[in-house]
Amino acid sequence: MKILGIDPGTIKCGYAIIETKPKLTLIDAGFIKITEKELQYQLSQLIEGIDMIYDSSIDEVAIEDIFFAYNPKTVLKLAQFRGALSLRILQIHGNFSEYTPLQVKRAVTGNGKAKKEQVAFMVKRILGIKGDIKPLDITDAIAVAITHSQRVKC
């Protein structure tokens, strides 16, 4: 089963595609860099990026839910990105699953309060990856895909 994991962001949107059989394997990972200045063009850039990475062989899509932020403007902008992303996934795939950062951290590290670096360490360990994976948006997206693989018991 192929799973697309997505870590939404307003500057970088991490993505990862994993295969679950015969064992968890990383197929592709990266990020969509948002460089436009105006919101409408940023959203368009995000959608174009999703269209470039999505292919019909993907069986499941999992997206990390919005985290709590102190700045209301940040939350609002992230919610707009998340809404555009959700709509596009529904249009091209039909459905998706959502996981909170707490659920993802707990699934991958056993600790819902783990730091991003701890998540990255465990992602590399689970997949047997040597070396660094940068930026951390990518390891977060991989962690979302791993979390989904555990939930659907593939």
UniProtKB/Swiss-Prot annotation:
Gene Ontology cellular component terms for the protein in this record: cytoplasm; Holliday junction resolvase complex
Major enzyme class: hydrolase
Cofactor annotation remark: Binds 2 Mg(2+) ion per subunit.
Gene3D superfamilies named in the record: Ribonuclease H-like superfamily/Ribonuclease H
Binding residues for Mg(2+) 1: D7, D137
EC number in record: 3.1.21.10
Active site: D7, E64, D137
One Pfam family cited in the UniProt record for this chain: RuvC
Keyword field contains Magnesium: yes
Main subcellular localisation: cytoplasm
Sites where the protein binds Mg(2+) 2: E64
Subcellular location: Cytoplasm
Cofactor requirements of the protein: Mg(2+)
Keywords: Cytoplasm, DNA damage, DNA recombination, DNA repair, DNA-binding, Endonuclease, Hydrolase, Magnesium, Metal-binding, Nuclease
Catalytically driven reaction(s): Endonucleolytic cleavage at a junction such as a reciprocal single-stranded crossover between two homologous DNA duplexes (Holliday junction)
Alphabetical GO biological process terms: DNA recombination; DNA repair
Superkingdom, taxonomy of origin: Bacteria
A single GO molecular function term of this UniProt record: DNA binding
Record-linked PANTHER family: CROSSOVER JUNCTION ENDODEOXYRIBONUCLEASE RUVC
UniProt similarity note: Belongs to the RuvC family.
HAMAP family found in the cross-reference section: RuvC
Subunit structure: Homodimer which binds Holliday junction (HJ) DNA. The HJ becomes 2-fold symmetrical on binding to RuvC with unstacked arms; it has a different conformation from HJ DNA in complex with RuvA. In the full resolvosome a probable DNA-RuvA(4)-RuvB(12)-RuvC(2) complex forms which resolves the HJ.
Main function: The RuvA-RuvB-RuvC complex processes Holliday junction (HJ) DNA during genetic recombination and DNA repair. Endonuclease that resolves HJ intermediates. Cleaves cruciform DNA by making single-stranded nicks across the HJ at symmetrical positions within the homologous arms, yielding a 5'-phosphate and a 3'-hydroxyl group; requires a central core of homology in the junction. The consensus cleavage sequence is 5'-(A/T)TT(C/G)-3'. Cleavage occurs on the 3'-side of the TT dinucleotide at the point of strand exchange.
NCBIfam families (alphabetical): ruvC
Name of this protein: Crossover junction endodeoxyribonuclease RuvC
High-level lineage: Bacteria, Pseudomonadati, Campylobacterota, Epsilonproteobacteria, Nautiliales
